[in-house]
Amino acid sequence: MTTISDLPYDLVKEIFSWVPFTSLRAVRSTCKTWNALSKNQIFGKKSVARNQFLELMILDSRVCSLRFDLQKIRNEDEEDLVDPSMKQISIPNNDDQVEISRVYHCDGLLLCIPKDNSSLMLWNPYLGQTKRIRPKNTFHRDDSFALGYNNRNHKILRLNEENESHIDVYDFSSDSWRTVPDDNPYRDELIYQSGVSLKGNAYFFDREVTTEAEVGTEDLLITGIEDYLRCFDFTTERFGPRLPLPFILPSPSFEYLALSWARDDKLAVLYSHYDTFDIIEIWISTKIEPNAVSWSTFLKVDMSLINGLTDDFLIRFEPKSFFIDEEKKVAVLFDTKVTETCRYQMAYIVGDDGYFKSVNIGVISNSHWIGGELVRSSYVPSLLQLQV
């Protein structure tokens, strides 16, 4: 009798190419041969290529997968459907269900930061492998991290606001931490939580604040705020020069910014100024290196022109994370919606032609009502072994 283990390789390959990332564990469990095959090569490239964006989000201190199917938006022949689905992902070897506060991503690997700051947890979701990383010195709540690599040797960057003259780097090849000097003269201006990994390096927002003394007092007045981009190069283990952002900033400038990854190794940056809070601009990089960047406009949206949006919504609207779909020419912006009894995680799909659609992802149930943080859009698997 023929069994599933007897199926031709090409057919097995085709089957796996259509399996969603979140269902791999169940499919692997059906057959030892399938389990071995899927852990030696990546079959899911076809599903990645489709317009089903697989996002990873932290919600209620748990890592969740959030799948958006944008194929049917702007489709005149069919109903305008998005149909998102969210699912909590169980972290292997996490029997005590450690709560996660932040997650950093690089090329299919996730670096999970537990709330108790006792250790780091490196996770390869595709292979179902984890690795605990103990600190050289005690981790702190305000530490920030980033994942990167040089010559395929992965590393972890640790930034500590209390120690601005040194940085800590964890090297996978030696399984150890080392402290290296940091000669970055603007380290105190880095916006630590903004780090995004791209092509093996990590990019952060950098802010320069200028002040002058107020006449007759000892107070300082802010006269200007300028934002830049800075790259941490994991090959040299140094920060590069300040890189320009594409906006013309008023002075003094008070705005909110968000940084995201776009397909084909590009960065996307979102900008909105508090004086014109209803205007949202998104730009994408046309060139991005540790010491150089150039930008092109992706879209500019005047939210006040969208029918049905109230002034109260526009004032409170502050998307903390986003991703873009270049083919559909839309951006998906993540924010929270507050009612008298609940807080909801929301996604807002916007286009520069006035297209707008709101999507209720679910109720935020944690006691602090903290909204979800988008970790990564268009997750692509990795075959890097964490357990040798």
Swiss-Prot record:
Residues 1-47 form the F-box domain. It holds the Pfam family F-box. Signal peptide: none annotated. This is Putative F-box protein At3g49520. NCBIfam families: F_box_assoc_1 (TIGR01640). SUPFAM superfamilies: F-box domain (SSF81383), Galactose oxidase, central domain (SSF50965). PROSITE patterns: FBOX (PS50181). It comes from the Eukaryota. SMART domains: FBOX. InterPro entries: F-box-assoc_dom_typ1, F-box-assoc_interact_dom, F-box-like_dom_sf, F-box_dom, Gal_Oxase/kelch_b-propeller, SCF_F-box_component.
